């Protein structure tokens, strides 16, 4: 399936929905392999962690995290990563001009070359800003989960999750502040995968 997405990404000239599906599929594949590894490795410390009462909250965090990764992929494939060139504001304001209808049109035309994106700036801002707002929501949810886990025998897991979350937020901010250096963008993707 990933091979097909790779082929379509090139043959359809970087059509954003295909590129997003390809990147998102890679994250899902990595997550499944990681899950299989953790199950097969049978780490003993995982048997002693009592987090059953927080599974619901963890599941909500996971769903929002998958949505956030989709938004990150959509931001990347629509070349919207630099639509908000400042931080914490976006184009000097907290409520910039945004066009959600165009920004989240999943049925973009097949045929044109999407290299560097075809969307107008307000559409790109809507995409980028959605990624930022969802990051705030996800951070709040994960901090609640970390706080809950901190007072169980899963405190080491909570502190690790907190450090990875802090690193991910820092990389996201650095992407904007330092105008998207490739090594920071790659690290942002790798840490997103680690959060899964």
Could you say what each language-model-derived stretch is?
Residues 1-196:
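Polytopic transmembrane helical bundles with strong interfacial aromatic enrichment
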């Amino acid at each position: 399936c990933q091979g097909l997405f790779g082929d379509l990404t090139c043959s359809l000239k970087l059509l954003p929905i295909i590129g997003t599906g390809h990147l998102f599929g890679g994250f899902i594949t990595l997550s499944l392999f990681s899950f299989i590894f953790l199950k097969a490795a049978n780490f003993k410390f995982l048997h002693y962690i009592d987090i059953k009462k927080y599974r619901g909250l963890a599941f909500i965090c996971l769903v929002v995290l998958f949505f956030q990764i989709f938004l990150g992929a959509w931001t990347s494939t629509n070349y919207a990563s630099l639509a908000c060139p400042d931080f914490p504001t976006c184009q000097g304001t907290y409520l910039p001009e945004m066009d959600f209808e165009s920004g989240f049109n999943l049925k973009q035309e097949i045929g044109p070359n999407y290299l560097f994106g075809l969307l107008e700036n307000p559409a790109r801002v809507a995409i980028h800003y959605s990624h930022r707002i969802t990051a705030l929501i996800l951070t709040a949810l994960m901090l609640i989960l970390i706080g809950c886990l901190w007072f169980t025998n899963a405190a080491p897991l909570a502190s690790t999750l907190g450090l990875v979350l802090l690193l991910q937020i820092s990389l996201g901010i650095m992407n904007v502040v330092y105008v998207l250096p490739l090594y920071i963008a790659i690290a942002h993707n790798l840490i997103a995968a680690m959060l899964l």
